[in-house]
C-alpha cells in the first residue's frame, strides 16, 4: 500500500499538469502559434523567391565576414593617359589557368590574404611600386583576429593580370592603412597612416618588400591619408588633421613642404586649405601625379557616405604662400549595376603610375555597400521583426485572443505601520498610475468593441494591418538573412571574368525582350547582350534599359541556326545562350558561369533531359528526375565556349544536321548536344539547379513549344535523325554529384 501511495501523483502536481494542458489549449497560445506559423510561411516564401538569390555569408568562413566598414576590393586599370583609364576586362587580358577570358575586376579581394593564411574582411587603399616589369601592390587588409588594418603586399609578373599574395609587410599594435610607398636616394620608404599612434611615421625597407624598420617620426600629429609629391624643386606633403579645432571630419586638407621627404616640414601659409563640406574632396584619395607638366590630386567625395567616390583636381598654383586647384574629369566610367558591381556603391582611392613603355597603369579600390551597411541592415531587420510582433499582439488583444489582467493589489504596497510615512508618496504615485491604466483600459475596451463589429471598414482595417505585418516580416527576413543584398559573381582560382549573353528573338516578342535585357544586364559578370534578330523590324540599342552594351545582330534568314552563328565582335570566350522567355536570378546565372569556368570544355545549363529508349524518345525534366540523372542540356539556357561550339556547329560535318534544323524550325539545341558528344569521349554536359526559373513560353503565341505534344513529337524525330548521323549521346550523369549541391 505504501508503494502504491508513493506512485500516486500529489494534488498540486496534478493541478500543475492540468494548468499546463489548459494553457496549451488556451486561445492566446493557439493564436500565437497560428501567427508564428503564418509569419514563417510568409518569410519562407520571401526567402525562396528573393533572399535565396543573394550571396549569403558562409558560417564556416574564417575571412570575408560582414564588416561595418564595408567589403572593399581592388581593381586594375590601364590607359595611354591617367585621364583615360579603362578596367582590365576591356583590355583583353586573359588567364587560361583560371578560365578567365578575359580577366575582370576586382583582381584582389578579401579572399586573397585569407587564402594566403591571413584571414581578412576587406582590402583597400592600394599603392603600386613598379620595379622593372614587376608590379608590387601594397594595401590595407583588415585582419579578422585583431579587427584592425595591417599592410599586405602582393606581386604581379604580368602587368596586373594575376597576383601572388606575399604576406604582411607591416603589422603594428595599432591600425595601419594608406601605405604610401616611394623611392628616395636608392632607398624604398613607406609612410602608412597610423593616426591612433598620434604621429606620422616613416619606415624604410630592409628586405623589400616584406621587412621594414622605423626610420623616423616625420610629424607629431595624427595625420590622415598623407601623400608626398616632388614638384617645382620641393617635396610637398598633403594630409588631413581631424583634431584641428573647428573643422568637419573628412573635409579638412592641409599642406606642408620641405627640401627632403625626411623633413623637417613647414606648414603652408593657407592651412587648412579646406575645413568644411565633405563633398569637395578635401581628404586625399591616393597618390598625386604629374601628367604633361601639370600636377593632379585625387580626393575623396565623402558626401552621403564615407569614400563615396574619387574626385580629381588639377593643381593650378602651388607655392609656399598660395594654393589653387580646379576639378577635372577623372576619366573612369562609374559602375551602373549598384550592389551587383564590386565598386557599385563607392570608390575612394586611386594610384596611377607611368610604366617604362609610356603607358599608364592604375589600381583603384571599390565597395558594393555603403559605410555601416551591415549595422543598418541589422537595425532595419530587428525593427521589422518588432513591428510584426507588435501588430500580432495588437490583433490578439483586439480579437480577445490575448488578455492582460493586473490585479488592484498590484498598485497597493503591503507595509508595516512603522513604514507608512515612507511609503505614502509611492502609494500616491501608484494610485495615479492605477487611474491612468483604468482609463486606458476603458479606451481599449471601447476600441475592441468597435472593431469586433462585422463591418466593411473593420474588415478593411484588419486587411491593412495584415498587409503591414507581411511587409515587416519580409523586411526582417530581407535584412537579417539577406547578406549584403547583392547577387555577387563567383571567383575561380581567385579571379573574376565575364561572359556575353546571346538571345534570339522576333518583333512579336519585343515587350518580353525589354524585361529580359533590363533584368540580366544587372548581373555582375555580363559583359554584353547580343540580340539575334531573326524576323521583323528591329529596335535600336537605345530602346533598352540596360547597364551593359546591347548589340542588335540582324539576320537575313529566319533560322534557328542563327543562334550559334560565329560572331567576331564577341569579346569573351564564355557565352550564355538564353531564351528571352526565361527569367532566373542573377545569382543562379553566376553559379552557372562558375561551374562552366571549372570545366570550359562542357556545356553547363539549367534545363536537364534524359534521352533513352529504343527508339530514342524526348521527354521532360520530370522524367530525368525519375531516372535520377541526365545526359543532355537544353541550350535555351546554357553556357558554352563560343570559339569551340560555334565553329563546331558551322563545320562541314554538321551541315546535314543544320539543314534538318532549318527545315523543321526546331532541335538546334539537340544538334549541339550531339556535336559536343561526338567531339569528346569525356563528359560534355553539366547541370546547375536554379533556385527558381520562370518560363513564359507557354504564354506566348509565337513560341515553338506552346503545343507541348507536337513539340515533343518533332524532337523525338530529331533524336532519331541525329543519332543516325552522329552516334549516341553520352551516358547518364547523376544529380547531386557536386559537393556544393548546386546540381540537386
Curated annotation (Swiss-Prot):
GO cellular component annotations of the record: membrane
Chain ranges passing through the membrane: 31-51, 378-398, 460-480
Localization per Swiss-Prot or TrEMBL: Membrane
GO terms of biological process kind: lipid glycosylation; protein glycosylation
SS bond list: 667-718
Ligand binding (Mn(2+)): 581
The keyword Transferase is assigned to this record: yes
UniProt pathway annotation: Sphingolipid metabolism
Chain's role: Essential protein. Glycosyltransferase that mediates the glycosylation of glycosylinositol phosphorylceramides (GIPCs), the major sphingolipids in the plasma membrane; acts as a HexN(Ac)-specific GIPC sugar transferase. Responsible for the glycosylation of a subgroup of GIPCs found in seeds and pollen that contain GlcNAc and GlcN (GlcN(Ac)). Maybe involved in the maintenance of cell-cell adhesion.
Protein name: Glucosamine inositolphosphorylceramide transferase 1
Organism of derivation: Oryza sativa subsp. indica (Rice)
